[in-house]
Each structure stands twice: as structure tokens, then as C-alpha cells.
């Protein structure tokens, strides 16, 4: 149950689990857009399973429901393809069903935006004095980063949610 762990499943493949993990990593690393789904992408170098080992759609759905990312043989019969890239995160810390970090694209998008924000703040405010004007300048930079992410179609509805973006001094660590 981890938003940063992916468990791929391809029944009957003669390829080693480590090769399947490596192929998945190659596909994820080669995709520049963190928000673009990886569904149907081929896993290079993975041997296809025998037809008797192919998974049924109901088995794939069960795997997905339980935080396992199934792989299937493509229509051409020669390539292993991602069904849906998900993490093992299926329940929150209090034990209730939670899909918030299930899709790999969600986690990759969060990481991308977080790094973009961190890099911008480090670039614009490397040795900034903390005063009452700083918070508004930081907020302005954050809005710019978020709007650029929306232009790249990584985020949606940024302007509609700007009222929820709070930048304030920490009263316990002024």
C-alpha cells in the first residue's frame, strides 16, 4: 500500500521479474509528460506469455482493484503491453478505500509540480530576507509555475483554485 511502488503482473511470461521491472522503468522514464497515461504502451524486451496464460478482463480488474498493475499480450501477439499503470496504494492510513495515489500519472504529476515549485523558489529566492512582502512575491511565483503547468496540460483548473493557494509566514518559526 504505497503510492510510490508499482507491482506489475504478467502471468506466464518467460521473462524474469527483474526484466519486467526494468522494462516498466524504461517506459516510465521515456515518457516526458507525467500526466499522460501509459496504457497500451509496449514493454520492450518482455517475452509474451502462452495463449493459455492470457488473463481475462475480470482477472485484470481484480488485479487493478488490489493495487497490481496487469500486463497483457498486445493484439499483434508479439508484444507485452501495459493495461494500466497503477501503484499499490489502495487504502488510506485509517483503512478506508482511497484512490488518490492509485494512478502512476497522479504520483508523477505531483512529483513534477513539486519539483518545479521547489526549483523556482530556489532560483528566485536563494538568500531572501523574510519579511511581510516576501509571502506575496512567493505566491506570485507559485501562480506563475502553476499556470505554466496548466499550459503544458499537466494541471487543470488552476485559476479556479487560486483562492485556495495560501502562502503565509510560519507563526511558530518567524
Name every feature range the model reports, one short phrase each.
Residues 1-26:
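Strand-loop microenvironment adjacent to phosphate/nucleotide-handling motifs in alpha/beta enzyme folds
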Residues 14, 28-174:
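Structured, hydrophobic secondary-structure cores that serve as assembly/anchoring elements
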Amino acid at each position: 500500500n504505497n503510492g510510490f511502488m508499482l507491482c506489475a503482473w504478467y502471468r506466464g511470461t518467460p521473462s524474469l521479474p527483474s526484466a519486467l521491472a526494468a522494462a516498466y522503468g524504461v517506459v516510465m522514464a521515456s515518457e516526458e509528460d507525467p500526466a499522460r497515461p501509459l496504457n497500451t504502451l509496449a514493454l520492450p524486451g518482455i517475452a509474451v506469455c502462452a495463449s493459455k496464460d492470457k488473463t481475462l478482463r475480470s482477472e485484470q480488474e481484480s488485479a487493478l482493484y488490489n493495487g497490481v498493475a496487469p500486463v497483457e499480450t498486445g493484439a499483434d501477439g508479439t508484444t507485452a503491453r501495459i493495461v494500466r499503470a497503477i501503484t499499490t496504494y489502495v487504502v488510506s492510513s485509517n483503512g478506508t478505500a482511497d484512490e488518490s495515489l492509485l494512478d502512476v500519472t497522479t504520483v508523477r504529476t505531483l512529483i513534477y509540480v513539486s519539483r518545479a515549485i521547489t526549483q523556482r523558489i530556489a532560483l528566485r529566492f536563494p538568500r531572501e530576507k523574510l519579511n511581510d512582502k516576501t509571502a506575496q512575491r512567493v505566491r506570485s511565483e507559485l501562480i506563475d509555475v502553476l499556470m505554466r503547468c496548466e499550459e503544458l496540460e499537466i494541471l487543470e483548473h488552476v485559476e479556479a483554485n487560486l483562492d485556495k493557494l495560501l502562502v503565509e509566514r510560519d507563526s511558530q518559526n518567524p
